[in-house]
Swiss-Prot record:
This is Maltodextrose utilization protein MalA. Has a role in maltotetraose utilization. It comes from the Bacteria. InterPro entries: Maltodextrose_util_MalA (IPR016546). It comes from Streptococcus pyogenes serotype M1.
Length: 271
């Protein structure tokens, strides 16, 4: 039998074949199994973190729906008349409306009070910051960034939206990175814990049958963790090319279930 002192190196040898996975189901304690789960998911996060850290932009509207919708054919020219110098927006004070959408450029104090009383979707740019306001009054802010840039070069709605989106991203890159990583971690870890926990629970139920040799929850947990190894390696490889947490989670979940099926086919859950 494998020596517990070899942990965590011995985990690799436990996963080389279905029979080894089943035979070593009781070799690790619960905290060692938990550590293995955390370690495998942490490995997945390495290429994902590198990808997110090297991103040059990210769509604001994936975080706040319709946040750039105030920039329309009727409003965008309020921005293009301005310029940015030394992180300061300069230009005329203009407010343009398109139905329930408002684009306010360098509004006065009176204008800001009026806008605050409205239930409209707004983009407000002051000398030093951008404000993205939802109809219910929630705000997302970003600093004005740039040393010397004329916005007159932005001749289409898409170009203006891309520019404003980049202003937001440059100001909030660290927060965006943290948000994306947290979302990825939660989805992948929740998927892993659900399949491992439920799998161990249902395997424990087999102890009532004399046909199988899984005696308790700990052994069921150990077997599920052993089955997690190869799907996690595949998920790590995929994460170098794909940063979709749902796909990565499904790779681990269904891969683990397939490995468990393979173990059952080879061992019938008997030593």
């Amino acid at each position: 039998m494998p020596d517990k002192k070899q942990f965590p190196i011995s985990y690799i040898s436990h996963c080389l074949s279905p029979r080894a996975m089943f035979a070593s189901r009781a070799q690790f304690t619960w905290w060692q199994n938990l550590l293995i789960i955390v370690f495998l998911n942490a490995l997945i996060m390495i290429p994902v973190t590198l990808h997110y850290a090297n991103m040059t932009t990210y769509p604001l509207e994936r975080i706040v729906t319709k946040s750039l919708s105030p920039i329309t054919d009727k409003t965008y020219q309020a921005l293009t008349q301005g310029k940015i110098e030394k992180d300061t927006f300069q230009g005329q004070s203009l407010i343009r409306r398109d139905g329930e959408l408002v684009l306010a450029v360098l509004p006065t104090k009176v204008d800001l009070e009026q806008l605050a009383s409205e239930s409209t979707r707004q983009i407000i740019v002051t000398k030093k910051e951008w404000r993205f306001v939802t109809p219910d009054g929630k705000e997302l802010r970003a600093h004005v960034r740039g040393q010397q840039q004329s916005l007159a070069d932005l001749t289409t709605v898409k170009a203006v939206k891309d520019f404003v989106n980049q202003q937001w991203y440059d100001s909030n890159k660290a927060s965006v990175l943290g948000f994306l990583l947290l979302t990825f971690v939660l989805m992948v870890c929740v998927g892993t814990l659900i399949v491992i926990g439920l799998g161990a629970f249902f395997l424990t139920l087999t102890k009532r049958s004399r046909l199988f040799m899984i005696r308790n929850f700990s052994e069921g947990l150990g077997l599920m963790v052993n089955c997690l190894a190869w799907p996690s390696l595949l998920a790590i490889a995929l994460s170098f090319f794909i940063q979709d947490p749902v796909l990565i989670m499904n790779c681990q979940v269904f891969g683990t279930l397939l490995m468990l099926t393979w173990v059952f086919y080879k061992t019938q859950f008997r030593d």
